Amino acid sequence: MKNISLLGYSDKLSARPGETVSFKISSTLKKKFTASLKRSISADPNPKGVGIIEEDASKYFKTTSYPSREQDFNPGSYAISKKPIKISIKKNFTLSVIIFPTISSSKDQSIIAVNNFEIYINSKGLSTIRVDKKSISIKEPLELRSWYKIKVKISINGNVSISQKILKYKDKKEITNKGKLIMNKDASGKVSLAAIISKGVASNYFNGKIESPQITVDNKIIGDWDLSSNTSSTVVDSIVGPTLILKNFPTRAVTGSKWDSSEMNWQHKPKHYAAIHFHEDDIYDFEWDTDFKLKVPKNTPSGIYTMKIKCDEHEDSMPFFVAPTINKLKAK
């Protein structure tokens, strides 16, 4: 919202007479903005073409002014568990995940986090384990667009090992680093993938694919997610542990670490498409509050309409379609 002073969207792209369209606006301006309805005849901005032609439609919606207010939004896709996972450690805690990083960043990129524990890629491109504010990193940077398995094991006495293995080179050995980090015996909390969540706000988004996250406590698997399941939805059912909810529509059924180009249809070999691709700029719904509504009058002709908002030199248009009334006779 740094560069756009006046911006809006509608909750639906089409409506029939009698139905309601809600409009959600963000304005950084101090003055009120004005909303007016137009019927679009031509939306061609080419000066050599017909041009933009609009008809006044104020008899269906009276031109009205509304107070300006800024509404924030947070792009970036991630997953978060529907419920907290109970983690009570007596001996050790292990977490493993397969990743395919696609973009380097000056910011940390969170891969998986729970409670005060996080695996992430730091600004130098190193896979890192963090507990509270202390961290240990692998000394060799990750290669972009390559599959890696990352595994972290922490014992109750604070001994930590973090390892990574690049999967495309079978003869290349696993790289490991060790250190000392103290973790809480009770590490219960919500699990997040591809972002870290603080006070309900996500940040440090991961760019790339994630596959097969797994949490083990005292050699017993308590969290295990098959990301190839239920791919038509925004819910990931668990094998063990709480369900994951996907935010801002990451891409599902994408090629995973087992994909060998033998099958191009993810439905035929779902295990070859067992990854989810997350992006820091994914967006689905800004979840803004409604500023005003239009209940489409019964006599409104079908066609393309635009709700235009304006404040001084700033303006925006929100197009939508008015469809004919169902079961009403139409001209032949």
Predicted regions mapped to residue ranges:
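Extracytoplasmic low-complexity segments
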Residues: T34-A35, S40-F73, N177-A187, S203, ...
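Short hydrophobic/aromatic patches on beta-strands that form ligand-binding or substrate-lining surfaces
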Residues: F93-S105, I150-V152, L193, I210-I215, ...
